[in-house]
């Protein structure tokens, strides 16, 4: 496997001495004699707790990359190893506590052999799924040793050096993947110079990791050029998210997701649910989150018409009867949200926000428009019912008194209101860590505010977050071991003299059981949707 050094004409092969184009034509070939044309994009299997319900959502990031590559003439195939092997759950290395969901190696190998990719790209978002990514890299090397390999996603971006310890990996993509992947493909085919390729990490012939800075966020660039991809894409500073094609929905096995029906939100009205993003980025700076680090600190929106066009395409071509907005903060731009919700009313489909909304940018008018336009379920990511914890440890700009009013108002409109809470925040920036009493106060707040249901999570120091940096600095986690086994149901943060991770995990589990077991929270989404019809 080979990768351009992006700073010279030299290429490295599995840590062996560097080769040059043409030195090994049977493996690499010259750009003018071999075209890197066929791209296999893989979503890896998922390793989860035995008693978890595996949520199965579309790998939209791969869909966007596939759409851009196809626009420029590349042949693409998406294989969602997790979804296609959803019913194949196997213990992990003899550990009955965890199950791995996904296709068997034989099934994956069969797809690789039949497609014969020139390039294999793998999604690497979560650190606790890294083993599954590296297993796919091993299979790719065994089956298609001449193929070039790359990974991208949050884990890959924050740990490029560790990822490149894998001899089966050629490149790590940093940041947003659409333009980075496209320019890299064009570079492999000799259509762009080294200077035009950015956002990639690789090992040079001396084994040192080299990193080229990331491209600007996509809101400030636009690919232009012929559909054939026979010439280099041009960068324009006039573009925005609307210039990215819709995800390549035709490369997903849509019927498989409809059959599984394990969408991110368990409260669904329809059975054929579509998912989409209307924006990227966030203006908040929550310590546990990485959205601002990966997607930017400014909100980047798609136009209302572009969003509606995608919903209509999903409805008309794939028969969706419900859609979910995957944005972290769909109401961050309140004026834009109003326009969007009015347009959703014309679409006439039920919809939900399982990822959450920006409650600090929410009012009664927006909730009215949401209910009128078909929103039957809304998720409010409160994080804590204690103002001190929000301000000093989480840094989320919420006023809990105002938030309580909005929760009750949304319930009065007939919407199911789900809450997200995090417990077990350690000392941060000189502020005292969250006490057990404050965690109980969060639970009490959820009860008093009137949530229909709630999820309580043990604080998890995910890669790239301020929380992780503080935990490492203060010795509250072991980054060499904990991060690769971390889930939101495990407590891996240990604060001596205050509490340990196991205690927090048990408390979160108790809160979830107690809060959601109440009979008066029984909920039938179809009845709620019927009640909201306009």
Swiss-Prot record:
It is an enzyme of class 2 (transferase). The keyword Transferase applies. Disruption phenotype: Disruption mutant does not produce fosfomycin. Its EC number is 2.1.1.308. InterPro entries: Cobalamin-bd, Cobalamin-bd_sf, Elp3/MiaA/NifB-like_rSAM, Fom3-like, Methylthiotransferase_CS, rSAM, rSAM_horseshoe, Tetrapyrrole_Bchl_Biosynth_MTs. Residues 268-496 form the Radical SAM core domain. GO terms for molecular function: 4 iron, 4 sulfur cluster binding; cobalamin binding; metal ion binding; methyltransferase activity. Pfam families: B12-binding, Radical_SAM. Residues 38-195 form the B12-binding domain. Coiled coil: none annotated. CDD domains: Radical_SAM, radical_SAM_B12_BD. One of its GO terms (biological process) is methylation. Was originally thought to catalyze the C-methylation of 2-hydroxyethylphosphonate (2-HEP) to form 2-hydroxypropylphosphonate (2-HPP). Belongs to the radical SAM superfamily. This is Cytidylyl-2-hydroxyethylphosphonate methyltransferase. It comes from Streptomyces wedmorensis.
């Amino acid at each position: 496997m080979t990768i351009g050094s992006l700073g010279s004409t030299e290429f490295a092969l599995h840590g062996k001495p560097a080769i040059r184009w043409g030195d090994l034509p049977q493996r690499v070939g010259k750009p003018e004699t071999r075209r890197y044309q066929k791209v296999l994009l893989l979503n890896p299997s998922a390793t989860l707790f035995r008693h978890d319900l595996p949520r199965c959502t579309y790998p939209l990031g791969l869909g966007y990359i596939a759409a851009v590559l196809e626009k420029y003439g590349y042949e693409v195939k998406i294989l969602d190893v997790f979804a296609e092997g959803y019913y194949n759950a196997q213990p992990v290395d003899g550990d009955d506590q965890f199950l791995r969901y996904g296709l068997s190696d034989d099934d994956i190998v069969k797809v690789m052999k039949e497609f014969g990719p020139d390039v294999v790209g793998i999604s690497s978002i979560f650190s606790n799924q890294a083993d599954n990514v590296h297993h796919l890299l091993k299979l790719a090397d065994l089956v298609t040793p001449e193929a070039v390999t790359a990974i991208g996603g949050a884990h890959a971006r924050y740990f490029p050096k560790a990822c490149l310890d894998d001899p089966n990996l050629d490149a790590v993509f940093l940041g947003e993947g659409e333009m980075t992947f496209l320019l890299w493909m064009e570079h492999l085919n000799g259509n762009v110079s080294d200077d035009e390729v950015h956002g990639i990490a690789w090992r040079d012939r001396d084994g040192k990791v080299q990193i080229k800075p990331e491209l600007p966020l996509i809101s400030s660039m636009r690919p232009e050029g012929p559909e054939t991809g026979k010439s280099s894409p041009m960068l324009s500073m006039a573009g925005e998210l609307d210039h990215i094609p819709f995800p390549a929905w035709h490369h997903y096995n849509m019927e498989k997701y409809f059959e599984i029906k394990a969408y991110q939100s368990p409260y669904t009205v329809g059975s054929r649910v579509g998912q989409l993003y209307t924006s990227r980025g966030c203006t908040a700076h929550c310590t546990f989150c990485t959205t601002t680090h990966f997607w930017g600190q400014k909100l980047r929106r798609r136009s209302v018409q572009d969003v509606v066009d995608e919903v209509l395409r999903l409805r008309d071509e794939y028969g969706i009867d419900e859609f979910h907005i995957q944005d972290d903060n769909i109401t961050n731009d309140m004026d834009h949200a109003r326009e969007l919700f009015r347009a959703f009313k014309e679409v006439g489909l039920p919809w939900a926000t399982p990822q959450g909304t920006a409650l600090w940018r929410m009012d009664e008018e927006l909730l009215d428009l949401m209910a009128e336009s078909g929103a039957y379920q809304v998720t409010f990511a409160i994080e804590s019912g204690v103002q001190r914890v929000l301000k000093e440890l989480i840094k989320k700009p919420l006023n809990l008194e105002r938030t309580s009013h909005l929760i009750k108002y949304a319930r009065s409109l007939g919407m199911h209101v789900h809450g997200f809470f995090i417990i077990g925040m350690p000392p941060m920036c000189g502020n005292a860590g969250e006490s057990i009493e404050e965690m109980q106060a969060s639970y009490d707040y959820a009860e008093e505010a009137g949530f229909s249901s709630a999820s309580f999570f043990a604080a998890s120091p995910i890669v790239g977050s301020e929380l992780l940096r503080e935990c490492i600095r203060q010795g509250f986690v072991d980054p060499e071991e904990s991060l690769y086994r971390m889930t939101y149901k495990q407590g891996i943060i240990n604060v001596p003299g205050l509490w340990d991770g196991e205690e927090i995990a048990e408390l979160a589990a108790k809160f979830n059981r107690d809060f959601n077991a109440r009979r008066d929270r029984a909920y039938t989404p179809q009845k709620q949707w019927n009640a909201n019809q306009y």
